[in-house]
Amino acid sequence: MRECISVHVGQAGVQMGNACWELYCLEHGIQPDGQMPSDKTIGGGDDSFTTFFSETGAGKHVPRAVFVDLEPTVIDEVRAGTYRQLFHPEQLITGKEDAANNYARGHYTIGKEIIDPVLDRIRKLADQCTGLQGFLVFHSFGGGTGSGFTSLLMERLSVDYGKKSKLEFSIYPAPQVSTAVVEPYNSILTTHTTLEHSDCAFMVDNEAIYDICRRNLDIERPTYTNLNRLISQIVSSITASLRFDGALNVDLTEFQTNLVPYPRIHFPLATYAPVISAEKAYHEQLSVSEITNACFEPANQMVKCDPRHGKYMACCLLYRGDVVPKDVNAAIAAIKTKRTIQFVDWCPTGFKVGINYQPPTAVPGGDLAKVQRAVCMLSNTTAIAEAWARLDHKFDLMYAKRAFVHWYVGEGMEEGEFSEAREDMAALEKDYEEVGIDSYEDEDEGEEY
């Protein structure tokens, strides 16, 4: 089988992990103690879920996941929570003191004490796999563990498992809801370090998710649980093709092949529809064309940026539920005619489509309604450079005054790393700019005679 190992790093990664595994269990009919009710006999029926769960001799299903945090409180909640029996206790790894929102602590001083036990555990999980496909790494950009430890881990995973794909789900620091002043520093340091190690990174902007919760679900003051449940639906849509059989199945490497035109430009924009509360869904029937249209609304994106100002390089539509290719083709044709979607001229306007017949699952007591069909769109657009520009600007404001830098230097970093990381980000912005430039402009000279 094509197994995937999930690694959840830091508070954000662990809490996203809780939401995701809760949803996976519901989708596959696995109980919180890891048992699958007896009607699904071992080896009978659909075994695609083994990409994410391993099965013990006793018929218990254990997630192929590792939870890591440099301080124990968040993972202690998992150890005492509803799903405490689901995870192998050794897959929940905690340190003693936290990274204090400091990239240098997560990457150098404290991270290096815990990296070996973590890699050991990952090695054991990898040994149980018959054909390991890759890693899904969940973390935030802003925290110390999420930024520092993740970048350390990605470097080591590249050494140990060179050819395996590594996909990230990263929480991008939100302008309004900031948990730390130094988020821009951490974000830029971690992006610079992991840029060459990550194959594909799905960014999730907290503010964008907040707005979706407020606007579409009528939650006045969304909590992290609300945000994570929405994020888990998106992660589930992206990974559904690995866990279920469908008409058009997509695997991890296929995403990269279709979404990443150049190795550095690997930050697809995710959009999910329909996000709708239970009382609204009761009164509306959402057709394939409606949810497909909703994907092109900037309001439904996971990162705040405006694709109408950018150009698309690639576009993947992942449908699940009651969807037939005929409807999809009609919906896409309609969008091509009426939407002003600009593709870069070196990329023909292809939409890659995946369809999974498993309808989306709603978490009992959650905010999202149970719907018949849903779609997740992954598009690689030059507009996401706006997000980097925002972050770089904040970095510059602080770094011009060398504010807070002594905390990083005190943990053994050199100031040169800051400027090096910032230059790399400037190069990334430039890359995005160049990708969007039409290719025929620079060829004109050669064609005069």
Swiss-Prot record:
**In chain numbering, where does the site feature Involved in polymerization fall?**
449
> Which SUPFAM superfamilies does its entry note?
Tubulin C-terminal domain-like, Tubulin nucleotide-binding domain-like
Q: What is its EC number?
A: 3.6.5.-
Query: A GO molecular-function term, please?
Result: GTP binding
One cellular component term from this protein's GO annotations in UniProt: cytoplasm
Q: Modified residue N6-acetyllysine is at which positions?
A: 40
**Motif window: MREC motif:** 1-4
What positions does the entry give for GTP binding?
11, 71, 140, 144-145, 179, 206, 228
Cellular localisation: Cytoplasm, Cytoskeleton
Cofactors per UniProt? Answer: Mg(2+)
Processing and modification events after translation? Some glutamate residues at the C-terminus are polyglycylated, resulting in polyglycine chains on the gamma-carboxyl group. Glycylation is mainly limited to tubulin incorporated into axonemes (cilia and flagella) whereas glutamylation is prevalent in neuronal cells, centrioles, axonemes, and the mitotic spindle. Both modifications can coexist on the same protein on adjacent residues, and lowering polyglycylation levels increases polyglutamylation, and reciprocally. The precise function of polyglycylation is still unclear. Some glutamate residues at the C-terminus are polyglutamylated, resulting in polyglutamate chains on the gamma-carboxyl group. Polyglutamylation plays a key role in microtubule severing by spastin (SPAST). SPAST preferentially recognizes and acts on microtubules decorated with short polyglutamate tails: severing activity by SPAST increases as the number of glutamates per tubulin rises from one to eight, but decreases beyond this glutamylation threshold.
Keyword set for this entry? Acetylation, Cytoplasm, Cytoskeleton, GTP-binding, Hydrolase, Isopeptide bond, Magnesium, Metal-binding, Microtubule, Nucleotide-binding
Q: Name one GO biological process term.
A: microtubule-based process
User: What positions are modified (5-glutamyl polyglutamate)?
Assistant: 443
Q: The organism sits in which domain of life? A: Eukaryota
| Its job | Tubulin is the major constituent of microtubules, a cylinder consisting of laterally associated linear protofilaments composed of alpha- and beta-tubulin heterodimers. Microtubules grow by the addition of GTP-tubulin dimers to the microtubule end, where a stabilizing cap forms. Below the cap, tubulin dimers are in GDP-bound state, owing to GTPase activity of alpha-tubulin.
Provide the assembly information: Dimer of alpha and beta chains. A typical microtubule is a hollow water-filled tube with an outer diameter of 25 nm and an inner diameter of 15 nM. Alpha-beta heterodimers associate head-to-tail to form protofilaments running lengthwise along the microtubule wall with the beta-tubulin subunit facing the microtubule plus end conferring a structural polarity. Microtubules usually have 13 protofilaments but different protofilament numbers can be found in some organisms and specialized cells.
Give the protein family: Belongs to the tubulin family.
Q: What is the protein's name according to its record?
A: Tubulin alpha chain
Q: Which organism is it from?
A: Xenopus tropicalis
